[in-house]
C-alpha cells in the first residue's frame, strides 16, 4: 500500500533537514545538490520577511508523484505516474504548529513547482492574514466590484467571483460569500506576487484575466503590506532604482 501523506508527514517530520527560518525538507525523490537551490533556497529566500513571520513551521517533501484515487480518497505518494485525473501536483497536511507540504516533482518544470509551492503558502496566509491586510484587501475588492471589473488572477478566485456576480449588486460586497471570495482572491494574487519576486514570470493574458491596471494596483497593495526582501524586486523598474543606489 502506498503511504498516505498524513502517515508520511508524521514519520518524516523528525527526519527533515533544516533549510533556514521555519523551513525544513525531505527528499522522497532524489534531487541533485545543485538543483536544491532552485527547489528550496531561492523560493524561500525570496519570501518577504512579513510573510515568513505569518507562516507556521513548514516541512517540504519533494515526492515523485502524488495520487488521489478518488475525490474523497486520501492523497498518497507513489513512484509510478498516475493517470492525469488522479495526479495531484501539491497537497498539505496541517499538524497544528507545523504544516507539511507535498509536491509532485518528477517530470515537472521547476517553475511549475514554484507556482504550487507559493499557492500552498498563500492559501495558508489567507487563513492567517492580519486584520490590516484583510481590511485593505476587502476595500480594494469592493472598489473593483463597484467598477464592475471583470476577470481574476486564477481559476479558483474566478469561479468564486462569478458566483458573487450572480447576486444582486447590493449583496455582493459583504457576507460569507464575499469573504470567501476575498480570501481566495488574496491567495491567488499573493501566489502571483510571491512567484514574481522569486522568478521572472509572464502573466498570461486572456478573457478571464484581471485587467493589467487592476492587477498592478493589487500587486502595489501587497508590496506595501508585505515588502520584498532586500535585493528582490516586484516590478521591473524596482530593479533599475536598486542599481542606481549602488
PLM features: residue spans?
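A metal-dependent hydrolase signature that marks the N-terminal structural subdomain at the beginning
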Residues: 1-112, 226-245
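Pan-zinc metallopeptidase signature
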Residues: 1-17, 171-246
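Exposed alpha-helical structural elements
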Residues: 35, 39-42, 136, 140, ...
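Active-site alpha-helix of zinc metalloproteases
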Residues: 107-119, 123-124, 180, 184
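Post-HEXXH active-site segment of zinc metalloproteases
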Residues: 111, 115, 126-164, 202-209
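Alpha-helix capping at helix-to-loop junctions
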Residues: 122-131, 192, 196
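An amphipathic alpha-helical core segment
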Residues: 143-178, 183-192
Amino acid at each position: 500500500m502506498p503511504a498516505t501523506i498524513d502517515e508520511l508527514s508524521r514519520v518524516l517530520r523528525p527526519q527533515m533537514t533544516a533549510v533556514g527560518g521555519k523551513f525544513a525538507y525531505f527528499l522522497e525523490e532524489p534531487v541533485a545538490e545543485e538543483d536544491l537551490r532552485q527547489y528550496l533556497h531561492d523560493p524561500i529566500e525570496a519570501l518577504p520577511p512579513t510573510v515568513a513571520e505569518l507562516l507556521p513551521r513548514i516541512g517540504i517533501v519533494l515526492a515523485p508523484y502524488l495520487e488521489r484515487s478518488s475525490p474523497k480518497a486520501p492523497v498518497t505518494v507513489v513512484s509510478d505516474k498516475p493517470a492525469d485525473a488522479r495526479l495531484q501536483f501539491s497537497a498539505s497536511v496541517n499538524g497544528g504548529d507545523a504544516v507539511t507540504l507535498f509536491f509532485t516533482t518528477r517530470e515537472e518544470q521547476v517553475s511549475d513547482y514554484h507556482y504550487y509551492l507559493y499557492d500552498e503558502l498563500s492559501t495558508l496566509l489567507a487563513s492567517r492574514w492580519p486584520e490590516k491586510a484583510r481590511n485593505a484587501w476587502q476595500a480594494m475588492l469592493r472598489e473593483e466590484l463597484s467598477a464592475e471589473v471583470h476577470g481574476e488572477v486564477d481559476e479558483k478566485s474566478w469561479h468564486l467571483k462569478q458566483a458573487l456576480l450572480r447576486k444582486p449588486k447590493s449583496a455582493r460586497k459583504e457576507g460569507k460569500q464575499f469573504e470567501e471570495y476575498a480570501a481566495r482572491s488574496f491567495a491567488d494574487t499573493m501566489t502571483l506576487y510571491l512567484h514574481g519576486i522569486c522568478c521572472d514570470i509572464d502573466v498570461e493574458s486572456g478573457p478571464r484575466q484581471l485587467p493589467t491596471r487592476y492587477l498592478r494596483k493589487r500587486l502595489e497593495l501587497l508590496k506595501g503590506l508585505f515588502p520584498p526582501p532586500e535585493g528582490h524586486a516586484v516590478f521591473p523598474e524596482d530593479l533599475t532604482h536598486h542599481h542606481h543606489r549602488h
